[in-house]
Regions:
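Phosphate/dinucleotide-binding and metal-coordinating scaffold of catalytic cores
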Residues: 1-109
Length: 109
């Protein structure tokens, strides 16, 4: 079972990020790409029909994570491993993030 998250830009579904055996995969949503005026979620992840692959969590997404005391508090309250960056992203980046991007965990049906 791969962990997945829907990535929203200003409340609009922009793409999906998932944990895969090789690391992480981010792909823009085809409807988002087809909509005129939509922006890339990051300068480091320009709009593309090809998925992005990385062995480590993309720095852009890592930048959405809390640090210091807030990180410790979130991990303690949510019972998260401080070193599970992707798990932290899925559990904490769904609201009140810096900027226009949020990540909502995609739960298995």
């Amino acid at each position: 079972m791969n962990r997945k998250g829907n990535v929203y830009y200003s409340g609009v579904l922009a793409g999906r990020i998932e944990e895969v055996p090789e690391g992480y995969r981010f792909a823009y949503d085809s409807d988002y790409l087809a909509t005129l005026g939509t922006r890339a979620i990051s300068m480091t992840l320009p709009k593309s029909t090809k998925p992005y692959m990385s062995k480590v969590l993309y720095p852009f997404f890592y930048g959405l994570l809390a640090e210091g005391v807030l990180k410790e508090t979130q991990c303690r309250k949510l019972k998260l491993d401080e070193n599970d960056h992707f798990g932290r992203l899925l559990k904490t980046a769904n609201s009140d993030t810096i900027g226009a991007v949020t990540v909502v965990e995609e739960l298995e049906a």
